Structures are given as structure tokens and as C-alpha cells.
Regions:
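N-terminal leader/linker segments that initiate helical-solenoid repeat arrays
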Residues: 1-30
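Structural signature of tandem alpha-helical TPR/SEL1-like repeats
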Residues: 8-16, 44-52, 80-89, 116-126, ...
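Canonical positions in the second alpha-helix
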Residues: 21, 55-56, 92-93, 129-130, ...
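Short helix-capping/linker turns of helical repeat alpha-solenoids
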Residues: 25-29, 59-62, 75-77, 82, ...
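Hydrophobic face of amphipathic alpha-helices that form TPR/SEL1-like repeat modules
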Residues: 32-42, 52, 66-75, 104-111, ...
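Eukaryotic tandem repeat interaction scaffolds
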Residues: 99-152, 159-166
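TPR/TPR-like (Sel1-like) alpha-helical repeat modules
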Residues: 175, 179, 186, 193-211
Length: 222
């Protein structure tokens, strides 16, 4: 127990240092962001955290704070709910190569929201860029849209392109991307012939990742 108390004391000391470095929003942007994280995650004081993220985003354009601000605005946590404002700050963070912000921005433009103009072309661009930047969730999200069979997807079906995206996602050890690639290569799809050797290869990788993560969120073996 003493060990936990010592860690907690050290953490509190570190946070006091960040508060000092932040200097009421006039100091270091990284320090201010850490104070916001502390208030949100540890203290559950979403009102204060939201104000800090808002100031750090609006005055410093600090991408991680803009991303957190966007999530708060989407959820109406600590700040009034606003899809339009969330889209704006996600766009700002994405422009500074914050890949999770690009993922959220792409999702919003795929499905739309209140107070902003849905832009499918922009959704595809930011998800593709985010995928290339190494965020496997973006690879998988865009690939799933390109594989929809119901005719209601926001983008036309394109299995070959989807395969490339899933391969990128799987190369980053993203279990869902590997799983979806396994299914595609077992069954084949338009422009993507079945490939038993590749299917076995990706199935083994999926199973290995699943074992490491104790399962991949309800996915079953292909």
C-alpha cells in the first residue's frame, strides 16, 4: 500500500509542476494539456478540464488539446454539445497530423452531423492519410465502407482498394484488419481472387494477435 501512496504522491507532485509550468494558460502548452488530462482522467472534473482544453486549443492550437476538446464537444462533457464545433477542432488537430483526430473527422464526414456540411471526399482523404500515417483503425474503417454490400455505403464498393488498406492495417498488428483480410482472402471478392496461402498466413497472424489480446472483440475465426 505504501508503494501506491508513494506513486500517488509523486504523481501529485508532477501535476503541481505542470500546473506551475502552465501558469494559468499562459505557460507551456504541453504542461497545460497534462493538467487537463489530470483533471479529466484522475479527478473527473470535466468542466475544468474542458475549459483548459478549449483555451489550449483556441489560443495555442495544441493538437492533443484540440482532439480532447472535440471529444468533449461531441459528448457534451464539460461543455455544451456541438457537432459543428467538434468537427472544427478535429479538423484543426488533423491538419497538424494528429491521427486520432483525423479518424474522428473522417467518421463525422462519413455519417454526418448537425451544423456542418458533410463531405464524403474529405472523409476518404483524411482516413486514407491517417491510415498512411500509421493509424490502423482508419485503415479498417475506410476498408469496411469500401466493402459494403447493401448499396447504402457513402462510397462505392472497391474491394481491391479495401484489400490494400487492410494490408496496411494488419502490418501494424491491428487484429480487426487482419481478421477482415482473412475473410476476404478466403472467400474472394470482386477484383480480389481467393488466395488460400495468404488466407492461412493472415489467419495465423489473426489468431496470434487474438491470443495476445485475449480475443478480438467478438470476431470469430473465418
Amino acid at each position: 500500500m505504501d508503494g501506491f501512496q508513494e506513486v500517488d504522491a509523486e504523481y501529485e507532485d508532477r501535476m503541481r509542476t505542470f500546473e506551475s509550468d502552465c501558469n494559468g494558460g499562459k505557460g507551456n502548452a504541453v504542461a497545460c494539456h497534462q493538467v487537463g488530462e489530470y483533471l479529466s482522467v484522475v479527478k473527473n472534473d470535466f468542466d475544468k478540464a474542458g475549459r483548459i482544453f478549449e483555451a489550449n486549443c483556441n489560443t495555442r492550437n495544441h493538437a492533443p488539446s484540440c482532439f480532447n476538446l472535440g471529444r468533449f464537444l461531441l459528448a457534451g462533457k464539460g461543455l455544451p454539445q456541438s457537432d459543428a464545433q467538434a468537427e472544427k477542432v478535429f479538423d484543426s488537430a488533423c491538419a497538424k497530423d494528429h491521427q486520432p483526430a483525423c479518424l474522428h473527422l473522417g467518421f463525422m464526414h462519413l455519417y454526418g452531423g448537425e451544423g456542418f456540411q458533410r463531405d464524403i471526399k474529405k472523409a476518404i482523404e483524411v482516413l486514407d492519410t491517417s491510415c498512411s500515417g500509421g493509424l490502423a483503425d482508419s485503415c479498417n474503417m475506410l476498408a469496411k465502407q469500401l466493402l459494403r454490400h447493401d448499396g447504402k455505403g457513402p462510397v462505392p464498393r472497391d474491394p481491391p482498394r479495401a484489400r490494400g488498406l487492410l494490408e496496411k492495417g494488419c502490418s501494424h498488428n491491428h487484429g480487426p484488419s487482419c481478421f477482415n483480410l482473412t475473410v476476404m482472402l478466403k472467400k474472394g471478392d470482386e477484383g480480389v481472387p481467393s488466395d488460400y496461402q495468404k488466407y492461412r498466413e493472415y489467419r495465423e497472424k489473426t489468431e496470434s494477435l487474438a491470443a495476445q489480446l485475449q480475443g478480438i472483440d467478438g470476431n470469430k475465426q473465418a
